């Protein structure tokens, strides 16, 4: 109580350091953490995609994230910097004292357009240039990460799968260039050099990773039909070459 105005507040310093990295609407302020551009084929397949939270999901906020992008482009074609948790002092038993320490756990969701090995050096340089030498930057889990992967929508294997699904369902499928979450897909796409296609069978309000995670019977039935047709065409049809480029 007697030190206000005399010593720095770790919570205030950390809050301002975070504000130097991400804006009030969630937009990333460092060019090094953002994709340089969205490939034309990616932008084309996302142009008509409408993002919804489902009956029980959260409402999609149209004005959140990078300005000038659609919600679909923000989640599937752009990077995000998320603050997952933040702590200063002892929130469970607050004292009238300036907190000496503060910590924030953050996450960068990134596409293939940026090398993630450059993220921490870019953040360090950005903070140092703005006088935040007292804010440490590090990575959890001993540097482990799932690297981004993407098979461009105009790839021959994507178009082959599109035709198969359309013939089975009688409807044109929605094509995504990649998912917005973490997947170990780079093991197949990069290490093994295989074209990878994911065919998810779920819906937006499935409560993924929650205690009541679930799937709907009609979607599972449709998924069984789709995959039966896909594997039938795989063994019976005219296939593209087995290569990723």
Please tell me what each predicted stretch does:
Residues 4-26:
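A short core secondary-structure module
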Residues 28-93, 97-101, 112-122, 130, ...:
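An extended, acidic, His-containing surface patch that forms the Zn2+-binding/catalytic region
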Residues 105-109:
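Residue-level recognition of well-ordered beta-strand positions that form the cores
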């Amino acid at each position: 109580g007697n030190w206000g105005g005399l010593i720095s507040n770790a919570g205030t310093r950390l809050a301002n350091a975070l504000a130097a990295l991400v804006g009030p609407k969630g937009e990333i302020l460092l060019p090094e953490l953002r994709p340089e551009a969205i490939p034309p084929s990616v932008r084309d397949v996302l142009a008509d995609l409408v993002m919804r939270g489902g009956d029980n999901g959260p409402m999609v906020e149209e004005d959140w994230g990078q300005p000038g992008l659609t919600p679909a482009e923000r989640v599937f074609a752009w990077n995000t910097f998320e603050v997952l948790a933040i702590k200063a002092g002892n929130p469970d038993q607050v004292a009238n004292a300036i907190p000496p320490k503060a910590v924030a756990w953050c996450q960068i969701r990134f596409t293939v357009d940026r090398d993630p090995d450059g993220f921490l050096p870019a953040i360090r340089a950005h903070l140092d240039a703005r006088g935040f030498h007292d804010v440490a930057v590090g990575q959890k889990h001993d540097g482990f990460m799932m690297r981004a992967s993407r098979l461009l929508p105009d790839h021959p294997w994507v178009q082959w799968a599109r035709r198969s699904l359309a013939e089975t369902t009688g409807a044109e499928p929605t094509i995504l260039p990649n998912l917005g979450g973490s997947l170990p897909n780079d093991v197949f796409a990069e290490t093994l050099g295989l074209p990878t296609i994911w065919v998810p069978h779920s819906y937006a309000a499935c409560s993924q990773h929650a205690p009541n995670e679930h799937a709907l019977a009609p979607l599972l039935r449709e998924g069984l039909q789709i995959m039966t047709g896909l594997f039938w065409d795989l063994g019976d049809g005219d296939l593209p070459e087995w290569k990723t480029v």
